[in-house]
Amino acid sequence: MSKKTTKDVRNLSDSEMSDKIQNLRKELFDLRFKQATRQLAKTHRFKEARTELAQLLTVSNERSRSNTSS
């Protein structure tokens, strides 16, 4: 999976963004479960998924704040 930039994230629609947020939260849950059962091979996915989730949540919060202040 290629690294997304903030510019790519800002181009997503609200529905796409919420879908990606939901998918990343599920992926993080699965990664934690695999790590606990010692089946996880790609530990770098934790950092990548958390970073991507943080970017999505930041842009989502920016949008919601700009909608309420306008």
UniProtKB/Swiss-Prot annotation:
- Family matches, as InterPro entries: Ribosomal_protein_uL29, Ribosomal_uL29, Ribosomal_uL29_sf
Record keywords: Ribosomal protein included?
yes
Keywords carried by this UniProt record: Ribonucleoprotein, Ribosomal protein
The Swiss-Prot or TrEMBL record annotates one GO molecular function as:
structural constituent of ribosome
- What Gene Ontology cellular component terms go with this record? cytosolic large ribosomal subunit
Coiled-coil portions: none
GO BP: translation
Taxonomic superkingdom: Bacteria
Q: Which CDD domains match?
A: Ribosomal_L29_HIP
Signal peptide span: none
Q: What protein family does this chain belong to? A: Belongs to the universal ribosomal protein uL29 family.
Q: Which PANTHER family match?
A: 60S RIBOSOMAL PROTEIN L35/50S RIBOSOMAL PROTEIN L29 (PTHR10916), LARGE RIBOSOMAL SUBUNIT PROTEIN UL29C (PTHR10916:SF0)
Name of the featured protein? Large ribosomal subunit protein uL29
Organism (species) = Prochlorococcus marinus (strain NATL1A)
Species classification: Bacteria, Bacillati, Cyanobacteriota, Cyanophyceae, Synechococcales
